[in-house]
């Protein structure tokens, strides 16, 4: 079993130069504005307001870093249980899409994000959040293609389909035809959260 023991806010950075020291593997959460990144991070770590969300989609332009301590139960050959612990850094990125900011500011914002995603050496996992109710949007496909364009051998991408409590089984099947292997999760109903933490832990640490 994999569980979160503790989580705390580290820093908000406008660009990679002000990011915290690279002390652990980083998990970058990204997706469209209003896809539910902050809500999902709070649900994953079982805290109500660790990650702050904006009432105006696209307004948040800072890269927010959080330290998350995980514990994993391991059984040895003799059947004895032990526990390993590891820290990951969750990174809540600004939403892609319709930010109501000046064009010059928007261009700088995109440049900062691009530099962080491409050149931050300790990013090991990209968690691409996709609204399961609006799964066939071009911007989500563009984000996926963008990540694939510079993905290193030591990095992975997970597609998490948010707000999945709104879908019935046939609708979920339709979504999986577009994103095979994606994981459904609901911050509201807390469904798929345990599996999501397991996927994050194992993939970020290359296990």
Predicted regions and their residues:
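Conserved G1/Walker A P-loop phosphate-binding module
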Residues: 1-98
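Canonical P-loop GTPase G-domain recognition
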Residues: 4-18, 163-207
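Short, glycine/charged-enriched secondary-structure capping and boundary segments
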Residues: 23-24, 44, 103-106, 141-145, ...
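Structured catalytic cores of enzymes that bind and process phosphorylated ligands/cofactors
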Residues: 27, 32-35, 41, 48, ...
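Active-site-proximal flexible loops/turns
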Residues: 49, 99-102, 138, 169-172, ...
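Conserved nucleotide-binding/hydrolysis micro-motifs of P-loop NTPases
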Residues: 57-59, 71, 95-97, 133-136, ...
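Switch II of P-loop NTPase G domains
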Residues: 60-65, 76-88, 94-123, 133-146
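Conserved C-terminal guanine-recognition region of P-loop GTPase G domains, centered on the G4
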Residues: 110-181
């Amino acid at each position: 079993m994999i569980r979160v023991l503790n989580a705390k806010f580290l820093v908000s950075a406008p660009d990679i130069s002000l990011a915290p020291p690279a002390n652990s593997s980083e998990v970058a959460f990204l997706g469209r504005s209003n896809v539910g990144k902050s809500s999902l991070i709070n649900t994953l770590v079982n805290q109500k307001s660790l990650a702050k969300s904006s009432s105006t989609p696209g307004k948040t332009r800072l890269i927010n870093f959080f330290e998350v301590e995980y514990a994993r139960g391991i059984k040895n050959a003799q059947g004895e249980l032990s526990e390993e612990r590891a820290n990951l850094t969750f990174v809540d990125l600004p939403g892609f899409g319709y930010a109501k900011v000046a064009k010059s500011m928007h261009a700088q914002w995109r440049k900062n994000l691009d530099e962080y995603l491409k050149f931050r050496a300790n990013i090991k996992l990209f968690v691409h959040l996709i609204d399961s109710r609006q799964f066939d949007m071009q911007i989500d496909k563009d984000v996926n293609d963008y990540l694939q364009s510079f993905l290193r051998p030591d990095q992975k991408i997970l597609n998490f389909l948010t707000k999945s409590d709104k879908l019935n089984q046939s609708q979920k099947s339709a979504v999986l035809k577009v994103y095979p292997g994606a994981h459904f999760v609901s911050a509201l109903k807390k469904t798929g959260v345990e599996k999501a933490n397991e996927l994050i832990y194992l993939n970020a640490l290359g296990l």
